[in-house]
């Protein structure tokens, strides 16, 4: 290989005489025997502060699609394929993570083998990733940690690229479309905190609780856990048939043992998925979800931090990283005890979700008693909530504002034909397509099943023009939010008894609120004093509870009815419209997921 190109001396070999990774100072030209490609300017991390990676799950998917296509291309079949990157330490770390993830997912390499290949030759070390806080980095997350997180997620079935929909992932992670991501399929969804009313505030789109109802019900979300101060009435969720819990602790801080214990108890006794939010849905939310995954799936602190950031970039911040490191041993012991007790129980007692914990301070009765119990014994005392209110702009506010300033992507690089989306099989965490039919009664918590498709092959990446529906994604943030505002009845699912095989666009009713969008909106100010989150020291927790916040006077105590009037300007999360490909589009990812996908680990 060195004889063919002196530049490839020291390149990392992943497939002998076939796939290589190299760090080069200059952009090389492909030759008759070598094909070069780079993704440094194509797959770019959207940072909050000094954070620069790892790249999210959709970008990992797109990279794997791209590389699989090259490896299966007839025109490149006799060439060595070289993924090259620059000496920019941040881009280089992300590029190494991508090809390492490919090696773990498709080449059946262990994380250690993939990382060893990355270190071979004359390659310098890789810059470790950091958190999204303002201030000095106090916790290093290495490329190896991220590969180990990918491996654990694959082992436990947390993702499956045969059924993954990158368009839906990228659609719903946008702040104007809900700002949420699945962390554990069918179990945990992390999202930004709802607001009393759907509106745009300082350029940031805010969504009322009712905007999430159709999606939550469709995806079997039965429980909401709020970790921030109360800015909406929990009654709006409970009246719609959801369970709702309040486990407040200060923005940017770490939870007390009591809060962790009660969060785990709630999750272990909940049937269905749990939607967890704080203010931005990043720090506090990621920390508690991480505790559950460490206990029940035996992730290390580094593995779960890596996995959650791959699913939802910016999660787990500052002292929360060190908190998880400190809690790892005790959570593993708790998990071992939990599984031991479960193993010794008679099989007739049911699954994990039906096991009743012995905590004396938890009520598992009706909705009202649950709310009263959690509030009575909660950590969310007046002093802590008042402190968060007095601080005015908190870490969560800043992170949400920064995320809202991101420009919408022009057109997704992986489009799907509408025919391919008919009855497309999805993993448990996959999202749904809305139809124009009204939804059944909002009180039922049963969800219709997703149709299965004989085709599980991935779709060809397309750089071409998309259909008019997909072109909606190229509009400005105001146009996108305007198109998603309308009557709550719009865009809900078909009744379970009516099965449809065609994809229909959701009908959105125009609202007078769109006239506001056409005017000038204030850009989020960035002249606020920065919070050095890494210098935060935990304060002692109080056992007193709080029943309201300083913003309570502005809350709507009654839920918005289904037949919402246009002037109420209620937001509903719209679907992402698939693009189109020609009928001759190539399917190139068949049989690409190795047998590792079925290797579930039982502890």
Curated annotation (Swiss-Prot):
Residues covered by region (B): 177-343
SMART domains assigned to the protein according to its UniProt record, in alphabetical order: DSPc, PTPc_motif
GO biological process, one term: cell division
One Pfam entry name: DSPn
Residue stretches of biased makeup (Polar residues): 518-538
Single GO term (MF): protein serine/threonine phosphatase activity
Top EC group: hydrolase
Localisation per UniProt entry: Nucleus; Cytoplasm, Cytoskeleton, Microtubule organizing center, Centrosome; Cytoplasm, Cytoskeleton, Spindle; Cell projection, Kinocilium
Annotated spans, A: 7-162
Region listing for Disordered, in residue ranges: 518-583
Substrates-to-products reaction catalysed: O-phospho-L-tyrosyl-[protein] + H2O = L-tyrosyl-[protein] + phosphate; O-phospho-L-seryl-[protein] + H2O = L-seryl-[protein] + phosphate; O-phospho-L-threonyl-[protein] + H2O = L-threonyl-[protein] + phosphate
Domain Tyrosine-protein phosphatase span(s) in chain numbering: 179-336
Linker as annotated region, ranges: 163-176
Main location: nucleus
Active site: 278 (phosphocysteine intermediate)
Annotated Low complexity bias: 539-558, 573-583
Residue numbers of Phosphoserine PTMs: 484, 592
Gene Ontology CC terms: centrosome; cytosol; endoplasmic reticulum; kinociliary basal body; kinocilium; nucleoplasm; spindle pole; stereocilium tip
Tissues with expression: Expressed in the inner ear.
Function text: Dual-specificity phosphatase. Required for centrosome separation and productive cytokinesis during cell division. Dephosphorylates SIRT2 around early anaphase. May dephosphorylate the APC subunit FZR1/CDH1, thereby promoting APC-FZR1 dependent degradation of mitotic cyclins and subsequent exit from mitosis. Required for normal hearing.
UniProt note: domains: Composed of two structurally equivalent A and B domains that adopt a dual specificity protein phosphatase (DSP) fold.
Subunit-structure text: Interacts with KIF20A. Interaction is required to localize CDC14 to the midzone of the mitotic spindle.
Family under the similarity heading: Belongs to the protein-tyrosine phosphatase family. Non-receptor class CDC14 subfamily.
Annotated protein name in UniProt: Dual specificity protein phosphatase CDC14A
Origin species: Mus musculus (Mouse)
């Amino acid at each position: 290989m060195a004889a063919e190109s002196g530049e490839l001396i020291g390149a990392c070999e992943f497939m002998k005489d076939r796939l290589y990774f190299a760090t080069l100072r200059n952009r090389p030209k492909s030759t008759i025997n070598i094909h070069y490609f780079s993704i440094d300017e194509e797959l770019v991390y959207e940072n909050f502060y000094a954070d620069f990676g790892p790249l999210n799950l959709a970008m990992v998917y797109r990279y794997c699609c791209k590389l699989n296509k090259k490896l299966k291309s007839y025109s490149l079949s006799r060439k060595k394929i070289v993924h090259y990157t620059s000496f920019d330490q941040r881009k280089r770390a992300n590029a190494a993570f991508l090809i390492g993830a490919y090696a773990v997912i498709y080449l059946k390499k262990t994380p250690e083998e993939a990382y060893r290949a990355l270190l071979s030759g004359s390659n310098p070390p890789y810059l470790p990733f950091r958190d999204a806080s303002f201030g000095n980095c106090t916790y290093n997350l290495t490329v190896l940690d991220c590969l180990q997180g990918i491996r654990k997620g694959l082992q436990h079935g947390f993702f499956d690229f045969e059924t993954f929909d990158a368009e839906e992932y990228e659609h719903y992670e946008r702040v104007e479309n809900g700002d949420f991501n699945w962390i554990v399929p069918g179990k945990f969804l992390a999202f930004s905190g709802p607001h009393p009313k759907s509106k745009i505030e300082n350029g940031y789109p805010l969504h009322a609780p009712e905007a999430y109802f159709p999606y939550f019900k469709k995806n079997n979300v039965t429980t909401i856990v709020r970790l921030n101060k109360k800015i909406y009435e929990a009654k709006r969720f409970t009246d719609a048939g959801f369970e709702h819990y309040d486990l407040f602790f200060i923005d940017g801080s770490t939870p007390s043992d009591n809060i962790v214990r009660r969060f785990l108890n709630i999750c272990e006794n909940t049937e269905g998925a749990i939607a967890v939010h704080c203010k931005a849905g990043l720090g506090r939310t990621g920390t508690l979800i991480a505790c559950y995954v460490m206990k029940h799936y035996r992730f290390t602190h580094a593995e779960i931090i890596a996995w959650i950031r791959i699913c939802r970039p910016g999660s787990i911040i500052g002292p929360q990283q060190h908190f998880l490191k400190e809690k790892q041993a005790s959570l593993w012991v708790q998990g071992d005890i939990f599984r031991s007790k479960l193993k010794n129980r008679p099989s007739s007692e049911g699954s994990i979700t039906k096991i009743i914990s012995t905590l004396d301070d938890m009520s598992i009765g009706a909705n009202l008693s649950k709310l009263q119990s959690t509030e009575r014994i909660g950590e969310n005392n007046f002093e802590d909530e008042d402190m968060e209110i007095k601080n005015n702009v908190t870490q969560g506010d800043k992170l949400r504002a920064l995320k809202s300033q991101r420009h919408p992507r022009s057109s997704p690089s992986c489009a799907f034909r509408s025919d391919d989306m008919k009855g497309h099989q999805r993993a448990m965490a996959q999202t749904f397509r809305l139809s124009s039919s009204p939804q059944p009664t909002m009180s039922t918590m049963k969800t219709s099943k997703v149709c299965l498709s004989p085709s599980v092959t991935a779709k060809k990446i397309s750089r071409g023009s998309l259909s008019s529906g997909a072109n909606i994604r190229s509009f400005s943030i105001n146009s996108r939010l305007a198109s998603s505002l309308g009557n709550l009845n719009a865009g809900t699912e078909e009744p379970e008894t009516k099965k449809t095989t065609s994809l229909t666009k959701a009908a959105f009713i125009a609202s007078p609120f769109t006239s506001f969008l056409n005017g000038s909106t204030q850009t989020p100010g960035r002249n606020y004093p920065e919070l050095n989150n890494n210098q935060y020291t935990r304060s002692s927790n109080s056992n007193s509870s709080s029943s309201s916040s300083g913003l309570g006077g502005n809350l709507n105590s009654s839920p918005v009815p289904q037949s919402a009037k246009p002037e109420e300007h209620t937001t509903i999360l719209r679907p992402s419209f698939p693009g189109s490909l020609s009928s001759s589009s190539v399917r190139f990812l068949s049989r690409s997921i190795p047998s590792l996908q079925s290797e579930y680990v039982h502890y």
